[in-house]
Amino acid sequence: VYTSARRDGLQAQSLAVSFDGGYTWEKYAGNPVLDRGSADFRDPKVFRYAGADDAYWVMVAVEAAERRVLFYRSDDLLSWTYLSDYGPAGAVGGVWECPDLFPLPYVSGAGSAAGVRWVLLVSLYPGGVAGGPATQYVVGEFDGIRFVPDVAHPCVAADAAEAGEHRIGGIVE
């Protein structure tokens, strides 16, 4: 899934597939697969979410100027259903870019597995200390529908995760 920019200035999410390991790509004839009619809807990250009873695709994207992260679900990568959104929160200078959401296992003080927290990354541009890009992160819970930040530490300030004149859009695989 990628962001397609239309001639009228609007952005939508489209699909392309590769049958040769990523050397060439074939665009889906029915593109776009998700169109909000927005000029700032971009930067999708898609991952497979496995809940207790169901597994499906989750798309994390931004409404950049609104400083919101949007969550969608799909069973087939073609039809998307809105789940929820997060933001604005934390650093809100500039626009939000390149969101990422991933699980992070943690261990207890004794060294045994204790659970999983979810980390939401959002890049800002501008928004960094030096006026350039930066990345902030939020730790919380994701239940397959909604991201809820931890109350004790709702947001780590921009630049705490990443900063620099040309650094933006880190993605965790």
What are these regions (language model features)?
Residues H166:
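Cationic, low-complexity basic patches in intrinsically disordered or flexible, solvent-exposed regions
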Residues V1-D43, R48-C98, P105-A163, E173:
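Beta-rich carbohydrate-recognition and catalytic domains
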